[in-house]
Amino acid sequence: QLLENHPKLKLQLNTLDTRQNLLRSNIDLDIRVGNDLDPNVIARRLAPSIRILCAAPTYIERKGAPASLVDLHNHQCLFIKETDYPLGTWKLENRNKEHTVKLRPHLSSNNSEIIKLWTLQGHGIMMHSLWDVLDYLKQGELLHVMPDYWERADIFGVYPARLTQSSKVKACFDYLEEELVGMLPLEEIEAITQYSYDPY
């Protein structure tokens, strides 16, 4: 649809789980999930999103569900290894308070799909974007662990300053905003966080 509306637009899509240097990599627009943004880039929020803790029923049957943040130390926690984020750290929000939990990773990978696969196989607890695990939760393949805790992880578009007035970047932003709001589980996000989100 984007290319139909803007036939002169040239697109190259790269999918990576690690943050890129926009200038060095010659990237016009980078889609990032998470509120820990580099202050040296220009960012625009595209849509609200959160990450939640979840595990497979087989893991919960074997190990039980954690009863508190401290209890997470007794569990097998799976982490996405990011170059600019400390491995083994979760920043969880509860009742308007942020809690930083530092854990020893049981397994880690720089690929979020691998972490999701390990979790589905019952290897431990992961923190993952709600929109990416919602179907697994509905089907019972994953269970929501410690549902009172979550991490704010909005979806942002990030671009270099030289493209501030770029019509092609604006066209991409407008398209992504409209598409994401229709795709993301806003009602579920509000139910978990007790916040009312402005879609834009």
Language model features with spans:
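C-terminal effector-binding regulatory domain of bacterial HTH transcription factors
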Residues: L130-Q139, Y149-Y200
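Paired acidic/hydrophobic, glycine-rich loop segments that form the ligand-binding mouth/hinge
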Residues: L29-R32, G124-H128, H144
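Hydrophobic residues within well-ordered alpha-helices
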Residues: L22, L72, L117-G122, L137
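Central regulatory/effector-binding core of bacterial HTH transcription factors
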Residues: Q1-P39, A191-Y195
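Ligand-binding cleft/hinge of the Venus flytrap
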Residues: G88-K102, Y136
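Short beta-strand-to-loop elements that line the ligand-binding cleft
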Residues: L11-T15, V101-N111
